[in-house]
């Protein structure tokens, strides 16, 4: 089902605090210019966590209430950090500045407007789903993106926060679309899981300093990368963080993944399945690299030395004993088009170069266009097309090192 709409969170998805911190604004820094010298970072984090936890429990549905609650939050910050010597006037001034001076405190992430305009130009409808307060309307006016938006869903108006399903249902009702026709972009994986439960496809925004990819969702470091993902051009996930060498204990998961992948192929002839015994031999030889995300085997690949009689070079009659055969790559259907195939190609090339090998070889079904594109994008060259694997036709590829 074609997706027709994109919903966005605001904070660290489309917008950011100019100071780098939602609570420690420029006004705060002006009032307490030495706070970084006087207060240990861990102590500040703990104090902010207490104030933010209190804010999360408040019913903030008017600007006056927002101002009052923010003032109390800054009082709590001052009480927890006596080195600040925060006065009542300080708390009130910082809170009022945060509510009223949107331009000075918040900004769109670079490229946000252009990304939204691109999506609108492609016929996408756009909406916001945000845990936020009434001053958000001022922010959107200052950002100048209201004309690009078709729907607005705010936690303060509904009295619930993400990942409560009522947030997503409200947004979908405004759009008049099922979740299966929508994307949702947020920086928090828990919120993406809530949207996914209603059929939306999630993208994790990782623009915030120190953000780490969850792995279960495509990751975007910039608004433009969100557009790229929606257009099917991979994502910014660093798969090396999730890579492991597989062991005998992983064999059942390997077999299950092989079955899932084969069942999802457009043509079953694209892949020649292996037995568990064959996989066991490769695992025992230490040749199987996997991608594990939150305990789930998302993908694995196998590369073996190419010096034997059954090597791809030998099959083609090429005298190239110092080569590497890229034998298998399997990616769960849930993780397709996420750059994992290309990650394994780059990994095995790096290993082959470290061993001073002369070339890498692989075979691909000539009709398997996604795999062909991955190989050719990585600089592999087609040598020939011939029968292999019980009569199945395969294109043989080589990359010189």
Could you say what each language-model-derived stretch is?
Residues 2-110, 121:
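N-terminal helical cap/lid subdomain that shapes the substrate entry/recognition surface
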């Amino acid at each position: 089902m074609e997706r027709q709409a994109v919903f966005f969170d605001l904070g660290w998805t489309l917008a950011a605090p100019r100071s780098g911190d939602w609570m420690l604004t420029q006004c705060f820094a002006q009032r307490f210019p030495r706070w970084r010298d006087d207060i240990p970072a861990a102590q500040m984090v703990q104090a902010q966590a207490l104030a933010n936890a209190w804010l999360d429990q408040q019913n903030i549905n008017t600007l006056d209430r927002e101002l009052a609650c923010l003032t109390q939050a800054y009082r709590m910050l001052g009480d927890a950090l006596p080195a600040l010597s925060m006065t009542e006037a300080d708390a009130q001034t910082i809170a009022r500045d945060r509510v009223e001076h949107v331009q000075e405190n918040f900004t769109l992430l670079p490229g946000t407007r252009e990304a939204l305009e691109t999506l609108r130009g492609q016929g996408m409808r756009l909406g916001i789903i945000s845990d936020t307060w009434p001053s958000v309307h001022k922010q959107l006016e200052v950002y100048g993106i209201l004309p690009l938006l078709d729907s607005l869903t705010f936690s303060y108006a509904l009295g619930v926060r993400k990942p409560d399903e009522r947030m997503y249902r409200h947004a979908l009702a405004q759009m008049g679309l099922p979740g299966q026709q929508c994307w949702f972009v947020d920086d928090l994986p828990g919120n993406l899981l809530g949207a996914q439960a209603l059929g939306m496809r999630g993208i994790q925004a990782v623009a915030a300093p120190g953000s780490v990819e969850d792995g279960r969702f495509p990751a975007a470091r910039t608004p433009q990368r969100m557009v790229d993902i929606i257009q099917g051009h991979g994502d910014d996930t660093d798969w090396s963080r999730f890579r492991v060498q597989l062991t005998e204990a992983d064999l059942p998961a390997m077999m299950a993944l092989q079955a899932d992948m084969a069942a999802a192929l457009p043509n079953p002839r694209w892949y020649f399945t292996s037995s568990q015994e064959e996989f066991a031999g490769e695992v025992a030889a230490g040749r199987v690299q996997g991608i594990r995300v939150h305990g789930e085997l998302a993908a694995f690949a196998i590369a073996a030395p190419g010096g034997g009689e059954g090597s791809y070079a030998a099959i083609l009659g090429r005298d190239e004993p110092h080569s590497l055969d890229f034998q298998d790559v399997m990616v769960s259907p849930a993780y397709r088009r996420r750059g994992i195939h290309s990650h394994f190609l780059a990994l095995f090339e790096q290993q082959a170069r470290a061993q001073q090998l002369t070339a890498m070889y692989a075979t691909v079904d000539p009709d398997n266009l996604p795999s062909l594109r991955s190989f050719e994008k990585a600089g592999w060259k087609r040598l020939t097309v011939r029968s292999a694997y019980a009569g199945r036709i395969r294109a043989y590829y080589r990359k010189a090192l």
